[in-house]
């Protein structure tokens, strides 16, 4: 049984993105909460989400703000530009003119397999694009989906979209 998948983890019966002892996102029945410094920010209701993606490096070092800044400075010295790097975060587009939303989360001490990060991001994108984000508030449903996501081959990114769609259909 899978109790974690990339930065997604089941902690005390709830699914969270990020280290649950630090800054993280929590899947609640009515929406997603963002915990920063032990304080809960206002919950974003599931019906507000139209798209969702996750950005995380395999290791904490890859999500280091200092390393990202150093890379940016070095690239600028060479006359180049850099995109990416920085803290692990989830981005989403919200309905009703609320625009883009971004929430930073703390990287676990453990390594995230890059294939799991890609699959998780595609899963979150597809579930929101289908208008089914509210399902993320059901821990049993998320557990069933994560179990099936864990069976997907990590090295075939083109096949993931169809496979994830089939998993979502099967777990209705």
Where are these regions (language model features)?
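Eukaryotic intrinsically disordered, low-complexity regulatory linkers and tails enriched in Ser/Thr/Pro
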Residues: 1-24, 35-41, 53-172
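Short, solvent-exposed coil/turn segments at beta-strand boundaries
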Residues: 23-32, 47
């Amino acid at each position: 049984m899978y109790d974690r998948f990339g930065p997604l983890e089941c902690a005390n019966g709830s699914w969270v993105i990020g280290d649950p002892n630090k800054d993280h996102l929590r899947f609640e029945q009515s929406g997603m909460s963002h915990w920063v410094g032990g304080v809960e920010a206002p919950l974003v209701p599931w019906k507000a989400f139209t798209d969702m993606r996750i950005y995380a490096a395999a290791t904490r070092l890859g999500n280091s703000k200092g390393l990202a800044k150093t890379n940016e400075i070095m690239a600028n010295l060479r006359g180049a530009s850099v995109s990416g790097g920085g803290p692990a975060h989830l981005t989403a587009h919200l309905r009703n003119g609320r625009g883009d939303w971004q929430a930073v989360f703390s990287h676990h001490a453990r390594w995230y397999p890059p294939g799991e990060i890609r699959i998780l991001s595609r899963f979150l994108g597809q579930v929101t694009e289908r208008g089914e984000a509210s399902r993320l508030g059901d821990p049993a449903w998320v557990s069933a989906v994560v179990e099936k996501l864990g069976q997907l081959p990590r090295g075939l990114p083109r096949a993931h979209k169809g496979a994830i769609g089939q998993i979502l259909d099967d777990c209705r």
